[in-house]
UniProtKB/Swiss-Prot annotation:
Serine/threonine-protein phosphatase 4 (PP4) occurs in different assemblies of the catalytic and one or more regulatory subunits. Component of the PP4 complex PPP4C-PPP4R1. Interacts with HDAC3. PANTHER family: SERINE/THREONINE-PROTEIN PHOSPHATASE PP2A 65 KDA REGULATORY SUBUNIT, SERINE_THREONINE-PROTEIN PHOSPHATASE 4 REGULATORY SUBUNIT 1. Residues 326-395, 407-501, 539-569, 592-612 are annotated as: Disordered. The gene is Ppp4r1. Coiled coil: none annotated. This is Serine/threonine-protein phosphatase 4 regulatory subunit 1.
Amino acid sequence: MADLSLLQEDLPEDADGLGVDDYSSESDVIIIPSALDFVSQDEMLTPLGRLDKYAASENVFNRQMVARSLLDTLREVCGEERDCIAVLERISRLADDSEPTVRAELMEQVPHIALFCQENRPSIPYAFSKYLLPIVVRYLADQNNQVRKTSQAALLALLEQELIERLDVETKVCPVLIDLTAPDSNDDVKTEAVAIMCKMAPMVGKDITERLILPRFCEMCCDCRMFHVRKVCAANFGDICSVVGQQATEEMLLPRFFQLCSDNVWGVRKACAECFMAVSCATCQEIRRTKLSALFINLISDPSRWVRQAAFQSLGPFISTFANPSSSGQCFKDESKSSEDKDRIRDDGVVQEEQSRPEDAPSDLSAPHSSARLDGTLEGCAAETPGDSAGDMRVPADSSLLCTLSSESPQEAASDAESGKKHDNNSKSASRPDVGTSSPEPTPLDQEMFNSFHFWRTPLPQIDLDKELQQDPGERPSPERTGDAPAAPVPGSPSITMATRKELEEMIENLEPHMDDPDVKAQVEVLSAALRASTLDAHDEAGGAEQRSELQDDAVGAGGELPNCSISEDTSEPLVIAAEENMEATPDYIHGGADVGPGGGGGFSPDEERRPKVQDVVPQALLDQYLSMTDPSRAQTVDTEIAKHCAYSLPGVALTLGRQNWHCLRETYETLASDMQWKVRRTLAFSIHELAVILGDQLTAADLVPIFNGFLKDLDEVRIGVLKHLHDFLKLLHIDKRREYLYQLQEFLVTDNSRNWRFRAELAEQLILLLELYSPRDVYDYLRPIALNLCADKVSSVRWISYKLVSEMVKKLHMATPPTFGVELINELVENFGRCPKWSGRQAFVFVCQTVIEDDCLPMDQFAVHLMPHLLTLANDRVPNVRVLLAKTLRQTLLEKEYFLASASCHQEAVEQTIMALQMDRDSDVKYFASIHPSSTKLSEDAMSTASSTY
């Protein structure tokens, strides 16, 4: 009850009969009484007595202090259940206080009191549910705004800490919130209640949300009288969708969302645009593609600039919801490891790790899914001669329908792959003569149709091979019987093209009423062009289908058989194929299959460069709008920061499209990289390493390296983005390309502002990581001078990181064979720092030795030979700071090593003699640190204080 000492007594000024004029008549000495001379009446009261006294006070301040000290009172009486219940009952009476400030103060203490009751549940069972929760719920409808806000915050805090029982949520909380959102409820209270319902939905779970919250939420979305209510519903729409799941979202929420997106109030439409990504994540691919895309196009073309601004900011995140591991070539599972890093499974069922050079293929970036091997493939279906390039993925024309395509989850695909391989091993000899009629050498036409680019250009049908593999040769149908089966539609067929054209026509029709807006007019032009392109694509696909049909007829006529394959259409998700090479020797995996052409080289041919920016992963209209975000006119009509938003979401869009569609984004990325605003370039610089992982080494070397080089020469605000992820980017490059940057690392020491020491500190951090990427000679020739320069930096934080860098460098060079560079580095440390004329250099030498000992960068016998003699000579240094640090290092670090504790060598004797000399030093601090036991203090704290005190 410490706070009660501040309480004001409601007593007359002369009640105690004492005043400053009192004095002793005998001695005529004036006595001024002190408050410590009297026993306060409060000290004579019990905690409950003090609580009752001040809770009934007419002074508002006293009642506020009572509310603030309730938790302390509970702690004092927690040993007695009866007293705890008495305090809780007085809380209920205090909740009826007429002063809003008292009620608000009480509500601020409720979460703390509830937590105390939960921790002491055996003493006061059901205390919260019976005494506190009714107060919280009642205050949700309080007339005072401050009390309502405080109770709402308290309710959310209680739900977040799971202090409210599930039954109480259903029977006490939700009914009150539903009543507060009734049509006849107060407008302000209704709006706040809807917001509370939306925020508590993720905390109470799917079941309660669907049964109790969702019906009323749908009603509030259609509240015609209060646009504030609709705006709150729109702003929290994504949270509700993520809680209730896909089915409830599509059946109940989507119709309301469409209404909100066309609301008369622009604030409601803007809120819809801001939560569009969350809504999209809760729907299936088909609805996302057919309905939400058209709805989003309407928001992008909205008459209100604020709505368009919010829509463009959400465009990149919305496009990212179309991402599929099979189309992107990347799939990240647990432990943050890419599925591409998993072990490869050979035909014989033996798991082997992918062989790759460390400098060419870093551990966290390997070949994409497009370069994986086909699950359960047949040798006659995808034969390849040893002379073929690893970059070729050749599939004969007459067997193009024999490839197993997968649009399932990566986990399912992995399990199917194992079972498929086992089945393939058992049936390979039986199936080989019946399936394959293709020759080992593909024809030039095959190479043109099924090179890596055309292979990814259009999705292929999904085919089930199990039926054909499980049938005996005698049971397989004849070509005539196979031809009688009805043909299933494939992607790119006229029926699918008709659906696309119909979708485009509907979009154009919806936008025509807003043709006065230049943005809407531009959008109509884009959609019209897409409509014309879809018409042309329909003719091209029809011609290609006829050509494939002729090739298959020729194969059948030559004596081949087409197996009985059930073809199923799956246009809702991008497809991926994994091709397995059947070479008897060690398999050469297709590296970056989406990046390499028929000749195995990287990059794209001139014909591919000129191809239109068309893809099939996301609706083309969305991609066109995203690409238009770099248009200068957008900055004037939408948002001056629109280019920055485009740059921020570009890695997500690139991951969604996959590296096979990088040609759609290349020009946009180059435009952003040369943007006049440094914030745009800075955003790209911070994410270029992520984009390099997505694109693979071939495209990175061709398209990202030039931009990366430009960022290295940019402003410091841009360069810091490159520097923070320098190791992450360089490890993705080929060793030869990586070595080119050794000459540019020195430039990071030069900054626009010499006081920007954090830049140099980050450089030291990155150099520690870069040690593993370069050879010992490169480390010695290029990284060593930078490290020694940083060790002499003016700022202690930079020097501390640099000591770690030098010690790691000593470790790497000493482990090299032969350790010549390591010895030379140690000699340079001794010469430049151990014998430095400046005492700060000699102190740095001690710090480096200390770090080498702590991190075991050198074997102790080698340390005793190369560094310790020079270290011990500093015992006679004329500067006390150096001797203090030496005493700490010897006593607290060196003597803790087993080598110096167990061996009775001359090195141990030299250390003991040095410590004895330091214990007799004329400086008291040196004596202290040379005498104390190693475990009695922390070296890092003392050393840091020594370092900081010297500058």
